[in-house]
Amino acid sequence: MHREHEEMHQPSRRRRPPREVERPSATIRYEPVAEPEPWCSFCSWDLILILLVMLGAGCFILLHLYLYPNLEKVAPLPNIDPENAPYTWGTYRPHMYFGLRTRSPMSPLFGMMWYEQPNTIQRPHIRHWCNQDDRLPGYYWYEADGRHFGKQNISEAHKGVIQTDWINDANGFAARVKLNMAPGRRYNVILYLSAQEIGTRFRLGKHLSDVFHGYNELLGKFTMSLRLKDNTKLQTSHSVMLTDEKIPIDRYHDFVVDNTQAYNAPNQPLNYILNEKHNDEEGKFIAVQLNLGSQAEFDIILQTEKLKGMKPEEFTNILRIRSYNFNKKYENVFQLAGKNYTKTQLKMAKVSLSNMLGSVGYWYGHNRVLFNGIVQPYGPHVLFSAVPSRPFFPRGFLWDEGFHQMLIRKMDSKMTLEAIASWMNAMDTSGWIPREMIVGSEAEAKVPAEFIPQKNDVANPPTLFYVMDKLVNDEKTVGRYAGILKLLYPRLEKWFHWIRITQSGPTRTTYRWRGRNETIKTELNPKTLSSGLDDFPRASHPSDLEYHLDLRCWLALASRVLNRLAKSYGTDADYQRTAKAMEELNNFDSLVKDHWSEEAQGFFDYGKHSFDVALSPVPTPGSPRQFEYQRVTSRAPSYTLVSDAFGYNNLFPMMLKLIPSKSPILKSMLDKIRDPKILWTNYGLRSISRSSPYYMARNTEHDPPYWRGYIWINVNYMVLSSLRHYADQPGPYRENAENIFSELRANLVKNLATQFQKTGFLWENYDDRTGEGRGCHPFTGWSSLILLIMSDNLDT
């Protein structure tokens, strides 16, 4: 929110009246007196100018700080992370095929690159950061707990599989890499360490068993060694590289390729090796390249002075034990055995969880915020969060994170609380949390510059309350982590109040997402990015008098969670205050009054809306032969319920369980869900009714539909959760809810498994006409909720 500029008033300076000249009463003899030289004679005019400029700049800075104060973070919560978190290595670089670091800003970064050795001189296509353009047929963690170990397969099209397994141990880690590629092919694998802070230095060792030495203020002295399996040694050569240059973190792979040279020995195939001419004895980037055959296996061990080297059999045993414990807990929690799922469905289920946990990331640094018209650094932040997609969205998203943690909490509720606490620490003193956490240079490298700044008046769905609702109603979690829940309660309430105040609507019980563009002409329906539903149709002509159904429902859920927390951890006044908010926001009669249409039999947004708009080519002024697609309104807009767009947004009263189980309105909602002309498909619920004029409609000439027909798993999960609730409640519609639940679950599981088997991935969304996966892939985010959908404890 912009502050009003205060006028700066200066006191008026009145000119003094001239003094009257007095006549002397006596004549005084004049005695010449030596006058001092004017100060300007010994003071340079250049110096005067510099001083004036400095004074002006100082005044400007002080005035700017007064009128435009900086964003200020809340004080961090007491640390709830494990004591050894800064020293414990994990896969906290989710954008990489295989990368490790610790949860400390001082951690060195470990990474792996590889490419197939060309037979002719050319620039190799190197794999490093996850990239859809690499066109890999599949890569996923098939077992991973997000803390102690992981097992991953990376498939190369028609060439074979690279397997990466890892474990951590005290202050170090060990990894095993296996290449099982097509015969006759050769591969180069590059392993590197890079420094994040000045005090970290690396040196080269003398052989592979002592390949790197390093020092770091966090870890102390450490070494990295490579151990090749016997049959691998015979067909392996290696080269090393060390530099003290400052390399941009997103250009590591380019730097490696630029410093690679072709070596063509007589009667030998062409070999690419690293340039080993080193001008530095120590540096902040160090790499070793292994030239391997198609079948190879080697171990990587990073250890501090305090630890002994790990033997191959020790790695194998520890990995086996951790894998066993993971699988045992997995089955105890989700209980999929004996449920008649196919092998493909069971494989997809475990991959969905493992990818979610194996893609949890750690970031440190500032993000950028557009505050009072100026982009400012905001931070520093420490973010511990899952991500939606390793290649496309490898960073924290506030609206996604609540869904991520719905799954993670089932295996590791402590990890969920650590993630929620890190998001609460990103809050500013007013209660705002950035909707997208693009923190640090690695995260920024994956985002176009114009999309990096966040706006501090824009909210996002408070989905963390969705997972908190489950945590505070779980007796085991409450008993074990009461202290953490007590710490989180004031932050959650602050966030809740910020949303209620800044996103308020025209009346007390209505709310409006900020950020819609009232003047844009090139969009069919101006987007509501803050809602998370992006191009889902709202009122066609944005105004301050509109209000939004989903936001009202999110706040109703949040009020219930806060009341539960206040009862356990707040004062009597806290409890009374939250009870009042809960009663107001969960009042069904009020919801019906504000949002229900008896004629259309649905809940809807309200606003300035036209039922007759279209994107049409309009001649460009001054260039009659050129056209621009603009919104053309054939019928004047009026203030009304937006009843020509029924879809995901309109299901929120049911999804968040605000409709009484005996209300006829519930029957109407169930009927619309099951109607193939509206939302029902054989693959899941589509995002908007087929009868809506917005179904599969482009929002601009260049923007295809997004939330206008395709099937999204997070909302289907919310619908299933509510169906399970209503099927268990007394009322005339419980049998109908049970039947729809069973059919919808079966359709989702069958289609996602079909697409997983066909493509090797979970996808961002799915086509409502064919069931095919769409958008970015692999989508390790809320599409992984398919595992909860498959389990019987979907909503506990």
Curated annotation (Swiss-Prot):
UniProt xrefs under InterPro entries: 6-hairpin_glycosidase_sf (IPR008928), 6hp_glycosidase-like_sf (IPR012341), Glyco_hydro_63_C (IPR031335), Glyco_hydro_63N (IPR031631), Glyco_hydro_63N_sf (IPR038518), Glycoside_hydrolase_63 (IPR004888)
Enzyme class: hydrolase
List of catalytic residues: 534, 764
Pfam families per UniProt: Glyco_hydro_63, Glyco_hydro_63N
Gene3D superfamilies in the record: 1.50.10.10, Glycosyl hydrolase family 63, N-terminal domain (2.70.98.110)
SUPFAM superfamilies: Six-hairpin glycosidases
GO molecular function: Glc3Man9GlcNAc2 oligosaccharide glucosidase activity
Region described as Disordered: spans on this chain: 1-24
Alphabetic keyword roster: Endoplasmic reticulum, Glycoprotein, Glycosidase, Hydrolase, Membrane, Signal-anchor, Transmembrane, Transmembrane helix
Membrane association type: Single-pass type II membrane protein
Cytoplasmic compartment segments: 1-46
Motif annotated as Endoplasmic reticulum targeting, chain positions: 2-8
Deletion phenotype: RNAi-mediated knockdown reduces lifespan to less than half of that of controls. Reduced paucimannose and complex-type glycans and increased glucosylated oligomannose glycans and fucosylated N-glycans. Chronic endoplasmic reticulum stress response is believed to be due to the accumulation of triglucosylated free oligosaccharides as a result of impaired glycan processing.
Chief location: endoplasmic reticulum
GO cellular component: endoplasmic reticulum membrane
Region of interest: Required for endoplasmic reticulum targeting: 70-130
Function field: Cleaves the distal alpha 1,2-linked glucose residue from the Glc(3)Man(9)GlcNAc(2) oligosaccharide precursor highly specifically.
Protein name: Mannosyl-oligosaccharide glucosidase
Native source species: Caenorhabditis elegans
Lineage: Eukaryota, Metazoa, Ecdysozoa, Nematoda, Chromadorea
